[in-house]
């Protein structure tokens, strides 16, 4: 199905973006955020989404660090808080459901296991669409078959047969980006973390309460149950295994794989597996990071997971999407030359991305120990870390580093002074 929503722009800025046509591939989080700032700075963005409608499935995600400032500048911070899941924290539990460690939202200054702002991915996608739909052209149910970069434009051939010319093309289409595969020479930039993860929704139970519960079973298996704000519960199943391309199986095969892997896991896993059978929002992926020497080629650049996925383990994917989109739009508005704009975008973002992608060695083994002894030791350690005095000390030690991570340029004032 091919459909289009086309609206006129409401903002116009006197800068190098004025009247430029920019194709953004991907209507998740990074793409619409970029579209918002591009149209605000004077461009004509077009957001292209392969799915016939918004993809509103997904688990709870959070916004951290300077990402919060970006949503404030978009004037959607209040809406995000209103639609947040209201999770109170995460409890590490054993097979009997007993809490071994607990981290409230306030732990680590609101930047811990559960951040101050937690929202369902689908809710956030809807908020961004609502914020941009009146000023941005959206095309659903189509995708690029070819992207040909010319000296003064990019010609894109769509699966629908349409051919259009753009000044710039931005790939914001996720870790397995089609844009990246069409344009960039590095065909294998994904560094696998040897862990698989599945997300889906199950019926709510009174035992779910308002806290997430995280359970580990031997064999590197994890079961996470998270309450949402829609009267249901979000389940997450993950297991450690060397990369075997399970993400390429069809959904029924992936569900059967999980039934087999978690059959004897214990805790409330039988209930989760029962809900898995009828889950219609099932999503399965191999965890990995995207690492490229360069995020642009000619008039095409990458944004968010497509260019620098940090993986869910980092907890920084959504934040990188917001910050990257803001900086990319700002630098494109400052520089008439797209090469210089992309260079500055990368110069500002790459140090932050490098920090976000730094995962503690052995972090997957810590998150999902292989043995009962390993699980017990890890839970004991987390029980000690969860003590208020310890979390307070860790917060003080890391707070200064957090502040230094990224400083957002004030592009509104910069453009006003040009």
Where are the regions that the model predicts?
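Mid-domain catalytic core of redox enzymes
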Residues: 160, 209-221
């Amino acid at each position: 199905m091919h459909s289009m929503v086309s609206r006129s722009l409401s903002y116009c800025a006197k800068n190098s973006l004025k009247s430029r046509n920019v194709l953004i591939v991907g209507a998740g989080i990074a793409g619409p955020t970029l579209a918002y700032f591009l149209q605000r700075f004077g461009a004509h963005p077009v957001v292209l989404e392969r799915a016939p409608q918004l993809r509103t499935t997904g688990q709870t995600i959070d916004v951290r660090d300077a990402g919060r400032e970006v949503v404030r500048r978009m004037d959607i911070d209040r809406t995000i808080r209103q639609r947040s899941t209201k999770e109170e924290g995460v409890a590490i539990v054993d097979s009997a459901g007993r809490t071994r460690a607990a981290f409230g939202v306030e732990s680590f200054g609101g930047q811990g296991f559960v951040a101050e702002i937690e929202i369902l991915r689908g809710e956030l996608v809807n908020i961004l669409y609502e914020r941009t739909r009146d000023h941005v052209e959206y095309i659903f149910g189509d995708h690029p078959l070819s992207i040909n970069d010319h000296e003064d434009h990019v010609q894109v051939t769509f699966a629908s047969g349409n051919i259009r010319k753009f000044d710039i093309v931005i790939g914001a289409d996720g870790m397995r980006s089609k844009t990246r595969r069409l344009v960039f020479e590095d065909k294998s930039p994904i560094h696998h973390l040897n862990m698989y993860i599945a997300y889906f929704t199950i019926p709510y139970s009174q035992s779910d309460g308002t806290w997430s519960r995280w359970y580990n079973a031997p064999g590197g298996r994890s079961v996470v149950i998270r309450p949402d704000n829609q009267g249901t519960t979000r389940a997450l199943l993950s297991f450690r295994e060397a990369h075997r391309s399970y993400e390429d199986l069809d959904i029924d095969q992936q569900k059967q794989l999980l039934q087999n892997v978690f059959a004897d896991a214990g805790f409330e896993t039988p209930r989760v597996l029962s809900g898995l059978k009828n889950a219609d929002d099932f999503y399965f992926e191999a965890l990995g990071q995207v690492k490229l020497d360069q995020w642009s080629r000619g008039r095409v650049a990458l944004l968010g997971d497509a260019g620098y996925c940090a993986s869910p383990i980092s907890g920084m994917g959504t934040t990188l999407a917001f910050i990257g989109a803001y900086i990319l739009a700002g630098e494109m508005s400052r520089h008439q030359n797209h090469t210089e704009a992309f260079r500055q975008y990368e110069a500002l973002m790459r140090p932050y991305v490098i920090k976000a992608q730094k995962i503690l060695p052995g972090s997957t083994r810590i998150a999902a120990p292989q043995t009962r002894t390993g699980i017990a030791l890890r839970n004991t350690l987390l029980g000690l870390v969860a003590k208020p005095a310890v979390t307070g000390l860790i917060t003080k030690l890391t707070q200064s580093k957090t502040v230094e991570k990224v400083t957002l340029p004030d592009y509104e004032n910069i453009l006003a002074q040009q």
